[in-house]
């Protein structure tokens, strides 16, 4: 079954070029599916005009929405004329990430694509507050698209958590690998690599416990990770030569390997916590993301529930 048949593209209101829309069309050409070009807009000055009646205010809002809709249609003109099914929707909402997630839920969208900004071609991608909210709270996978052509023969790198005792991490690892393999097969037979990072010995342990042998500890940790990686790759018949178990912090290991492999995309799982720790995707994931220079696909566990609710007035 083809994946991602109902894509939501978040339009960037500040530029004519729309890399996320381009990537969605690229996917559509290979796996089919519908595309919705979506833009939440809000202008505080329109809310401040107390001299206007509610009807006049609504008409002004509607005027802005119509202008923006026509502008997006112009950006998508080439694709629309080529027969790509793109629906355009502009909404008035003062919290873009909520508008996007509400649209994902209401429209049952199975993938969100959004452009990631960067200072220049060499630097890491910069994530806005809206990006972070989406990565943490969007129930569907979120694909952050870099404003660069896909590298020739660009690979997909799946970051897996091999250390966890928690059963949900195994399920999430398997989901990441399965979905990436499926996507790679359907899109352009992309080579898929797996990476797991394992920690180095904490120096303070070696100092506090003179009889402690760091090399034995390191070997044991590496051995555990290698066994976990072997079990995972064998489940999916993945060749050992495209799996990587590296010593170091994930936020260093994963971006470095992505660059070394010239990966087009890194795929990460996030547990997406709510409540007190809602500010974190999991520190590790956030730090990895901050160091990346390629596209990013963030996938949540099956049981993830977003804290964002539909507005009552949503139809």
From Swiss-Prot:
Instruction: Tell me the keywords, alphabetical order.
Output: Cytoplasm
Query: InterPro entries, per this entry?
Result: UspA
Q: Where in the cell is it found?
A: Cytoplasm
**Main location as per UniProt:** cytoplasm
Superkingdom assignment = Bacteria
Which Pfam families does the UniProt record give?
A: Usp
Q: Name one GO cellular component term.
A: cytoplasm
Instruction: Write out the function statement from the record.
Output: Required for resistance to DNA-damaging agents.
**Alphabetical list of NCBIfam families matching this protein:** PRK11175.1 (NF008380)
Protein family (similarity comment):
Belongs to the universal stress protein A family.
Q: What is the name of this protein?
A: Universal stress protein E
Its source organism is: Salmonella typhimurium (strain LT2 / SGSC1412 / ATCC 700720)
Q: Which gene encodes it?
A: uspE
């Amino acid at each position: 079954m083809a994946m991602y048949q109902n894509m939501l593209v978040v339009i960037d209101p500040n530029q004519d070029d729309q890399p996320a829309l381009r990537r969605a069309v690229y996917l559509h050409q290979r796996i089919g599916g519908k595309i919705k070009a979506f833009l939440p807009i809000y202008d505080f000055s329109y809310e401040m005009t107390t001299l206007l009646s509610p009807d006049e205010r609504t008409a002004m809002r509607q005027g802005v929405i119509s202008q923006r809709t026509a502008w997006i249609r112009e950006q998508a003109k080439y694709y629309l004329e080529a027969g790509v099914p793109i629906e355009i929707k502009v909404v008035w909402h003062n919290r873009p990430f909520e508008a996007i997630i509400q649209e994902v839920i209401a429209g049952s969208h199975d993938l969100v694509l959004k452009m990631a900004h960067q200072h220049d071609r060499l630097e890491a991608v910069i994530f806005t507050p809206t990006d972070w909210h989406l990565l943490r709270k969007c129930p569907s996978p979120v694909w952050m698209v870099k404003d660069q052509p896909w590298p020739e023969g660009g690979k997909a790198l799946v970051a897996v958590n091999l250390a966890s005792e928690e059963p949900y991490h195994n399920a999430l690892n398997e989901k990441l690998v399965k979905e990436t393999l499926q996507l790679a097969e359907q899109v352009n037979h992309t080579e898929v690599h797996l990476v797991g990072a394992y920690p180095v010995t904490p120096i303070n342990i070696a100092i506090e416990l003179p009889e402690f042998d760091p090399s034995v500890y390191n070997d044991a940790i590496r051995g555990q990770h290698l066994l976990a990686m072997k079990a995972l790759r064998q489940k999916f018949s993945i060749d050992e030569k495209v799996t990587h178990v590296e010593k170091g912090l994930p936020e260093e290991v994963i971006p470095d390997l992505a660059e070394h492999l010239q990966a087009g995309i890194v795929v990460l799982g996030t547990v997406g916590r709510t409540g007190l720790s809602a500010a974190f995707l999991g520190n590790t994931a956030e730090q990895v993301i901050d160091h990346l220079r390629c596209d990013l696909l963030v996938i949540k566990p099956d049981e993830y529930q977003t804290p964002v609710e539909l507005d009552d007035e949503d139809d």
